[in-house]
Regions:
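Terminal targeting signals and extreme-terminal segments of soluble enzymes
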Residues: 2-153
Length: 153
């Protein structure tokens, strides 16, 4: 289904915070960039988020390994849903800084597992770390800062 620009599903403000669940995430991700990548949220809890990505051909660069942008998009999505759970009602957010280190390659058929942890939750920022594993091996580490946006009148 093709959506018009600016018409992607949004999580209603009244469903944020404690109501943020993997089921809500799945509905909101449908038809969006992370949803098209196949990002799944498995658990969204206090200070912790877990996600999964089954690697297939669309995730690979021409050399046959997972593209760098996929690592970042996967981790940023995990951190974003954790951020949403910890917002005050009516607030929004956006990523203002991120860093990713990839330690091990992933290929078609691998399943990546991400675990995000809230490192800092202030009034104006949240900092998240996301560790991505490929099997038993740490494959990537991601740290991002989210700026919290107050409601506009």
């Amino acid at each position: 289904m093709r959506r018009r620009r600016g018409r992607l599903p949004r999580v209603p403000q009244d469903e944020q915070n404690r109501q943020v669940t993997p089921e809500l995430a799945a509905r909101a991700l449908a038809g969006s960039f992370p949803g098209d990548l196949g990002v799944e949220l498995v658990e969204i809890g206090d200070g912790r988020v877990r996600g999964r990505l089954a690697v297939d051909r669309r995730h690979l660069h021409p050399g046959g390994y997972v593209h760098g942008g996929v690592w970042v998009a996967f981790a940023d999505t995990v951190a974003a849903w954790g951020t949403m759970r910890h917002l005050q009602p009516g607030h929004d957010f956006t990523t203002v800084e991120l860093k990713t280190n990839v330690f091990a390659a992933a290929r078609d058929g691998d399943t990546l597992a991400a675990e995000g942890e809230l490192l800092h939750a202030g009034r104006r920022t949240q900092v998240w770390e996301v560790r991505i594993r490929n099997g038993d091996r740490l494959a990537a580490n991601f740290v991002c800062t989210q700026i919290v946006l107050a409601p506009t009148s």
